[in-house]
């Protein structure tokens, strides 16, 4: 028999009754019922119930062990009997009557319980992450991540992509987030950087003559944490394709996402094909370029309805309406609570009216609406008895943010929100440029390296604020999974694009010398995308925080509490790396 086990703890069934077995695992739980000791033994594969009878050596040994100690047991599989079957366990029809016990590793008193999801704070969980990962939910999340990545690889190969590795030590990048830098021992005063993304290398692979590239790429950014973003390190499905237009990129990625979310979504419906929504339309209808399409409500721009209005709350402002059917009969509390939510999102209040059975409008602002206002709103919003309308007024961006959040919250409260579904969409036609509100200067809106729609002709003849870019995002349930673009592979177009944003040719040639040099040796048209693996798993696991799907994440302050990183270096290491440390002076 094997030194540690003949079977796993998730393997035994009623067909194994009478078999002598050896199991190893963690002491998950212990119960003493009428002098008989019942132990739940857990390993990676499941749980098997052990039974030890009083007066036996096995009973004495198991009775002394602390929870989460590792043990090896020898025993015989017996039937639990019809009255004692546990239908929640695959092994629930049997138990193992223990004859021999060997302690493999004793556990100290636990900082928190493993077999229940108690309210232990995240910092403690991350400090003892090796214990936290023993919990069923966390263990399941990490195994889901493993399966998702394995499936991505096989699906990408089936779609004709080739997996290739790109460097981890590279040059610093002048754009994007802050780099993590690595000092060079051999080249004093010089530094490598960990890649924020393999962006330049994957484009160089296309210029090198490869056609369809992918990798599960580690990326490093020195940025602050959010619920959907882990500080430090994250992983993305990095993709690049040659001789493609936008829809050529969409097709394989849409197929991949549909199949992936159907495979691991536990029956949640995946809407396909994914709608293509222009950026401007998304901002107007949903108040966000990351719309949650499970909310079956849309915003309507009614700014023109109140042009010249004497109603000061709306006059001269951008006004957005949110019509909500079947809520007119809701109590005043419904409207007040939605107003409180709007205030929590930054609004000063939330104006509203409702349509009665007689078709007349009532509510806090009904008296300020003229007959012309009411007629136009009724027509524009298709109002009918039972409807309510919520209004937001102010600057475009402010109203979009607030009313976009109100749209989703109202849908949830009013029963117009789809559950158990993955609603994807593509956001397309991003503006190439925007005007800096403080300086009034033209700057890039999103990705400066994307191809402008219309190419050089657009750059030379259109108002910069009217130029659209071949940029796109893929969004699922309000979570941005990735940005992508058709790349600007023509040096003259790139130089012109940067010139419009205020960069002279000398600066661009210096900062992006490597890419521009490669572009001048016959670069193919190419484009790509990089969906975030962590965010994909977060959605599939239905977790609110990305750190719940990563085995060993940093905390929100970019610290590894388990390993003690970041650490200080001793003076000899600093000298070897030609470094001195200057800590900020306390204020």
UniProtKB/Swiss-Prot annotation:
Function: Catalyzes the attachment of L-aspartate to tRNA(Asp) in a two-step reaction: L-aspartate is first activated by ATP to form Asp-AMP and then transferred to the acceptor end of tRNA(Asp).
Residue numbers binding L-aspartate: 175, 221, 446, 487
CDD domains named in the record: AspRS_core, EcAspRS_like_N
Chemical reaction(s) catalysed: tRNA(Asp) + L-aspartate + ATP = L-aspartyl-tRNA(Asp) + AMP + diphosphate
Region annotation (Aspartate) ranges: 199-202
Record-listed ATP binding positions: 221-223, 480, 532-535
Annotated transmembrane regions: none
Keyword set includes Isomerase: no
Keywords, comma-separated and alphabetical: Aminoacyl-tRNA synthetase, ATP-binding, Cytoplasm, Ligase, Nucleotide-binding, Protein biosynthesis
EC number: 6.1.1.12
One GO CC annotation: cytoplasm
Record Gene3D superfamilies: Bira Bifunctional Protein, Domain 2 (3.30.930.10), GAD-like domain (3.30.1360.30), Nucleic acid-binding proteins (2.40.50.140)
Main localization category: cytoplasm
GO molecular function: aspartate-tRNA ligase activity; ATP binding; nucleic acid binding
Keyword Coiled coil in annotation: no
GO biological process, alphabetically ordered: aspartyl-tRNA aminoacylation
EC class name: ligase
Subcellular location field: Cytoplasm
InterPro entries: Aa-tRNA-synt_II, aa-tRNA-synth_II, aa-tRNA-synth_II/BPL/LPL, Asp-tRNA-ligase_1, Asp-tRNA-ligase_1_N, Asp/Asn-tRNA-synth_IIb, AspRS_core, GAD-like_sf
Highest taxon above the source species: Bacteria
Stated name of the protein: Aspartate--tRNA ligase
């Amino acid at each position: 028999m094997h030194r540690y086990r003949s079977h796993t703890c998730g393997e035994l069934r009623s067909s194994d009754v009478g078999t002598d077995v050896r199991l190893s695992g963690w002491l998950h739980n212990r119960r003493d019922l009428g002098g008989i000791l019942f132990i739940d033994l857990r390993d990676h594969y499941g749980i098997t119930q052990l039974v030890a009878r009083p007066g036996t050596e096995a009973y004495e040994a198991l009775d002394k062990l602390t929870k989460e100690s590792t043990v090896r047991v020898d025993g015989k599989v017996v039937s639990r009997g019809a009255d004692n079957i546990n239908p929640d366990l695959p092994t629930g029809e049997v138990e193992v009557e223990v004859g021999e016990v060997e302690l493999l590793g004793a556990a100290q008193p636990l900082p928190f319980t493993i077999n229940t999801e108690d309210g232990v704070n995240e910092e403690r969980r991350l400090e003892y992450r090796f214990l936290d990962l023993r919990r069923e939910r966390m263990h399941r999340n990490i195994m889901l991540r493993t399966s998702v990545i394995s499936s991505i690889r096989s699906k990408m190969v089936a779609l004709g992509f080739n997996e290739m590795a790109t460097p981890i030590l590279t040059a610093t990048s002048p754009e994007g987030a802050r780099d993590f830098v690595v000092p060079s021992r051999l080249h004093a005063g010089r530094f490598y950087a960990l890649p924020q993304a393999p962006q330049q290398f994957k484009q160089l692979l296309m210029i090198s003559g490869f056609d369809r590239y992918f990798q599960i790429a580690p990326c490093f950014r020195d940025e602050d944490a959010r619920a959907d973003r882990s500080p430090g390190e994250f992983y993305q499905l990095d993709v690049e394709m040659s001789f493609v237009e936008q829809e050529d990129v969409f097709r394989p990625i849409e197929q991949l996402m549909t199949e992936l979310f159907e495979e691991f979504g536990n029956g949640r419906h995946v809407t396909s094909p994914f709608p293509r929504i222009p950026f401007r339309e998304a901002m107007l209808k949903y108040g966000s370029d990351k719309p949650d399409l499970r909310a079956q409500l849309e915003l309507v721009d009614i700014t023109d309805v109140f042009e010249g209005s004497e109603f000061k709350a709306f006059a001269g402002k951008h006004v957005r309406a949110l019509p909500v059917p079947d809520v007119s009969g809701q109590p005043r509390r419904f409207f007040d609570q939605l107003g409180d939510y709007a205030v929590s999102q930054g609004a000063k209040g939330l104006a509203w009216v409702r349509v009665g059975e007689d078709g007349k409008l009532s509510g806090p602002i009904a008296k300020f609406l003229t007959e012309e206002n009411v007629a136009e709103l009724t027509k524009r919003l298709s109002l009918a008895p039972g409807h309510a309308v919520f209004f937001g007024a102010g600057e475009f961006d402010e109203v979009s943010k607030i009313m976009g959040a109100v749209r989703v919250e109202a849908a949830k409260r009013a029963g117009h929100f789809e559950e158990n579904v993955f609603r994807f969409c593509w956001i397309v036609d991003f503006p190439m440029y925007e005007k800096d509100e403080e300086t009034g200067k033209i700057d890039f809106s999103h990705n400066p390296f994307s191809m402008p729609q219309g190419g050089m002709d657009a750059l030379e003849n259109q108002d910069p604020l009217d130029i659209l870019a071949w940029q796109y995002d893929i969004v699922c349930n309000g979570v941005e999974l990735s940005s992508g673009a058709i790349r600007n592979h023509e040096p003259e177009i790139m130089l012109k694009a940067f010139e419009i944003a205020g960069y002279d040719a000398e600066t661009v040639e210096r900062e992006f010398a490597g890419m521009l040099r490669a572009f001048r040796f016959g670069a193919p048209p190419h484009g790509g995308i990089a969906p975030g693996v962590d965010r994909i798993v977060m959605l599939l696991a239905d977790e609110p925080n990305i750190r719940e799907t990563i085995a060993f994440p940093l905390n929100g302050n970019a610290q590894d509490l388990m390993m003690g990183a970041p650490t200080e270096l001793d003076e000899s290491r600093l000298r070897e790396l030609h470094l001195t440390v200057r800590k900020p002076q306390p204020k």
